[in-house]
Amino acid sequence: MGSRDFISSLPDEVLGKKILSLLPTKLVVSTSVLSKRWRNLFHFVDSFDLEDSTPIRNADSFSDFMKDTVALLSNCPIKRLTLNSHYEKSSVNRWIRSALKRGCLELNLQSQYDHYLDIGIFFRNNTLVKLTLSSYRTFLRGNVPPEGRVFFPALKTLSLGAVVAKPALYNWLISGCPVLEELFILDVGSGDDQPTWTRSVVSASIKRLTIVFHFPHNTYPYEDDVEIKTPNLEFLDYSALRSDGSDVDYLDSLAEARLDLRLWELTNTFDFGEVTNLVSAIRNVKTLHLSSSSLEAFYYRCYTMPVFDKLIHLSIESDKENGWQALPRLLLKSPNLQTLAIKGLLHKVTYRCGNACACTSKPKKRYLYKRYEDDSPTSEVEGRCCLSTCRVKVLEISGYGGSLREVKQMEHFLRKLKYLETVKIGVEEDNDSEHLRTELMTLDIASSKCNIQFI
């Protein structure tokens, strides 16, 4: 019995929209040689993905093919256009215009090459829902429209890589989207690279904001205040070296924040930048994730620690280069904390970790000074144990290796956290979890309800 060709038996619309639309366009083009029917299926494709992973013999021939195809399909709807390669500027602009005229919902420009775009291409577009500009550099040309002009009336998701534009045009790219819900900004450079982000995000509609801003070789990009005016923000992921100042409104709706506030390597005294305003603005969060360097930034450059009344879940990362100096004050300022998650127990040994740590070193008198400027007494950190008063019920440890220091730290947690109900431990792959479990079960545990789980 001969084998049945299930693919060819499918309806044309299913083949075009459900199968071919998921493939790189160059691969779709190659199917046109199979038969006349397969060539006609191109009319049903509503997603175009132009990239280099599927090479063709002649790039010029492909561009000519696309030119002819775009002309033929001028009346067909299109959902998504992705450009991830190097094509002539005129071809790129023509394909974008054609896609937008055909009701394009998603446009992605993402490649290792420069793209040059005239902002006028996007005028009068009422359909685009998702826009990604993440090429090596995207140069936007044009002028800001008259005040009050809406840019993308339907755009909900905007991703900006190295977008080079006049500050007013860059900011209008964000503020001109009245229903924008998710914004992603990536601006990373090295050497003498200049930043493209204007250090400003102003939007009343944004709910999710991710910013990665990293220029480690020069403090110049960080001398201006970072401005964030997003009253309806629910999620913030912010990764950057500390700026000299910040202008962040109180984020009343913020439920989750992920902070990676990096320390400057150019100085040894941590004397540049501050995070006080930013930390105060996020005091309403329920879930807070902090990198290891964020803990040090909280200690050195956050002068007034707010009370995190709504904080339920706190997770921190550890490494051997950074200490837990801010952890005691942070725990004492989180009266309703229920879950404490720690990725890696090994950290830099320093007496400033206080009673949150089992490996404190003996302080030198010349270093005994008050770091914070709030009205809390020094005894709040140096006297009252931040763990004994902490009402954490769940302790989650990942990357546990079972070293002597880690065992001591686990013993310290188990003896001090009196309200623990569950301890979840993720063990490194090379370790014997059963042996580590037996070892931990011999330790004193303050809470009679505590259940230790290895995951």
Curated annotation (Swiss-Prot):
InterPro entries linked: F-box-like_dom_sf, F-box_AtFBL13-like, F-box_dom, FBD, FBL60-like, LRR_FXL15/At3g58940/PEG3-like
Q: Keyword Repeat, does the record have it?
A: yes
Record keyword Repeat present: yes
Quick one: signal sequence residues?
none
Q: Out of the domains of life, which is the source? A: Eukaryota
Task: Tell me where the LRR repeats sit in this chain.
Answer: 114-138, 152-176, 282-305, 308-324, 325-348
Residue span(s) of domain F-box: 4-51
- Keywords in alphabetical order, please: Leucine-rich repeat, Repeat
The cross-references to SMART domains, in alphabetical order and at most eight, read:
FBD
Protein name, as recorded: F-box/LRR-repeat protein At5g35995
Which organism encodes this protein?
Arabidopsis thaliana (Mouse-ear cress)
